[in-house]
Amino acid sequence: MSEMQQTRNGSVALSKDVLVPSVQRIGRREIEITYLGTNSAGQATWIMWNADDPHLIGMLSQGKMGYHFEQRTSTGVMLHENISLSRVQRALGG
């Protein structure tokens, strides 16, 4: 799959095309997501940006038991560990 796309049931599928940004609508937000490759721990890693007003939303990596999402907020960083992709979507307001 060349882009992160919503499947028929509304869940999200992530692209693994390295450094190819795609825009995904999650809730009312347009989010640009780019696969960076694997991190030093060998985990697939994506970066998320606000597509309308360029600022960092967070980093997502795929762990052994779920996803790790480091979310930037107005009050600091929130770290969500070992969560499902649907939970990431809810954290983003979708």
Each predicted region: which residue ranges?
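A short, structured beta-strand/loop element
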Residues: 44-73
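Generic low-complexity segments that are intrinsically disordered, proline-rich and/or Lys/Arg-biased
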Residues: 6-7, 22, 55, 81, ...
